Design a protein with these regions (language model features):
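N-terminal glycine/serine-rich phosphate-binding loop of ATP-dependent small-molecule kinases
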Residues: 1-104, 131, 159
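Gly/Ser/Thr-rich active-site cleft segment
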Residues: 2, 10-12, 88-89, 95-98, ...
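Short, surface-exposed amphipathic charged segments that create phosphate/polyanion-binding patches used
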Residues: 45, 120-125, 177
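Conserved donor sugar-nucleotide recognition element shared by glycan-biosynthetic enzymes
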Residues: 56, 114, 142
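Pocket-flanking alpha-helical
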Residues: 94, 116-120
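Carbohydrate-associated surface elements
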Residues: 111
Length: 177
């Protein structure tokens, strides 16, 4: 039975996927646009279930159908998500023990709600962070988002089992862990 590789990228404004055969030829491609929530000045969010997981599942179904293959023929899945580079930072979503998002995901460095938390972290850890990571604390750092949730959404923080990036969220949904 011929095997296939599937890759899906969840981006800021769209998600795209590709199914590639053993011969490294593209069997199917699919792209879907999605929105981004901007509820307040400087805030940028995604609904992790709807956008990240929903797009992942929808694109997967489309690729399998368009490729005319059985799901069992997929031997490898690669997933990438928005804002996971060093320059822009990571997105962050708090989840409960069943991987259910407790609020909207805070996007990578484009979300600037955590200014007070950046200042606090810089006062307390700035010198060490710059030495260890080569850059000052910024809005893209996951720690700023976690501290913002702790300070501004204490009930969400209290109920949080884990804070996940987009890639971690997709992995947790796929594996159940």
């Amino acid at each position: 039975m011929k095997q296939y590789f599937m890759g899906i990228d969840i981006g800021t404004y769209e998600s795209r996927g590709m199914l590639i055969g053993e011969d490294f030829r593209v069997t199917a491609e699919h792209t879907v646009a999605h929105g981004m929530s901007h509820p307040r000045q400087g805030w940028f969010e995604h609904d992790a279930d709807k956008v990240w997981w929903g797009d992942f599942c929808g694109i997967s179904r489309h690729l399998i159908e368009a490729g005319g293959i059985a799901p069992e023929q997929i031997s490898c899945i690669g997933a990438s998500t928005l804002g996971t580079d060093c320059l822009l930072g990571c997105d962050c979503v708090p989840v409960d023990e069943h991987c259910r998002p407790l609020c909207k995901a805070i996007l990578y460095g484009i979300d600037s709600r955590a200014d007070k938390e950046i200042q606090w972290l810089t006062r307390h850890y700035g010198r060490d962070v710059r030495r260890l990571f080569g850059h000052p604390i910024c809005s893209g750092d996951t720690a700023t988002k976690i501290l913002w949730i702790k300070n501004n959404e204490p009930e969400v923080y209290r109920r949080t089992y884990k804070f996940l990036t987009g890639s971690s969220f997709i992995t947790a949904k796929l594996t159940g862990r």
